[in-house]
């Protein structure tokens, strides 16, 4: 007689405790169903699972925290980090929406926050990477890549000039090098510069900062020093660069200010160094130059933190409030008149102005009627 199959009706399997006379209760779950549960997902089920996970993640990101400080942090992250981990095509599309001016020679964009202009260690995506894609979006698939005419720091926003031809890019670069381009930046400062308008012309050099966190910073290298109440000229360093910055306070409160800056020279981190070390008024969100001895989140007063809706432990989320507000390019190529280009403030900058009680200058309203003044969309 053949042995009964495992799936035969009435078959009972003795357990290890059969010595006590107990039997397993027949399982209602078949071996077939177990095999089905361990079977690899087919394409449809996998797609449904991925969609569900994506929707769940999106819901988490859209969920508004109940804690007001966390809400403020989420807002800052949204304004400053949304373009740092996107596909190159997405970034190129966003840059195309930020075009301030376009002609047969130039394309001028409003550079977003947090994007480096060039690649380097740890850089996943930069503006130069997507210039070929942007050119094709604007002029078709046969278009040659756009060329950079100058650079802005990763954390700086505002007017940035690109050229269609390499020769034109070199001409614009020469205008910058020979100081023929008039540049205006806006910055929110911690504390108020005194006097309210003036010129900082202290040379700048790069120096290593010793300590637990060894790093390099740009610093001041004055040409004079005080000796027994007298100003004495010191020997110039070969590593020091001439640096000149004109500034004017546009609006102020007892603890902060909106400052317009006109760099005459173009030294690395010039505006940040002149404000932080020359005027003792670091830019809001400048976590590098607010303290010479270390790299750490900027320390702010309790009053400033309260206005910004943050705690000191969350100060690291505050972005650098430095914006390339305006450029004036002289006549160049086929253009017979100067080109004035200006762009609006980024959202986080404008919100900080309101929170800190700083006013937009009235004279800025009339600038929108000037010839060749192109406002960012």
UniProtKB/Swiss-Prot annotation:
GO biological process: mitochondrial tRNA pseudouridine synthesis; mRNA processing; mRNA pseudouridine synthesis; positive regulation of mitochondrial translation; RNA splicing; rRNA pseudouridine synthesis
Cross-referenced InterPro entries: PsdUridine_synth_cat_dom_sf (IPR020103), PsdUridine_synth_RluA-like_CS (IPR006224), PsdUridine_synth_RsuA/RluA (IPR006145), RluA_PseudoU_synthase (IPR050188)
One Gene Ontology term of the molecular function aspect: tRNA pseudouridine synthase activity
Enzyme Commission number(s) from the entry: 5.4.99.-
Family designation: Belongs to the pseudouridine synthase RluA family.
Self-association and partners: Interacts with 16S mt-rRNA, mt-tRNA(Phe) and mt-tRNA(Met). Forms a regulatory protein-RNA complex, consisting of RCC1L, NGRN, RPUSD3, RPUSD4, TRUB2, FASTKD2 and 16S mt-rRNA.
Name the UniProt record assigns to this protein: Pseudouridylate synthase RPUSD4, mitochondrial
Organism for this UniProt entry: Rattus norvegicus
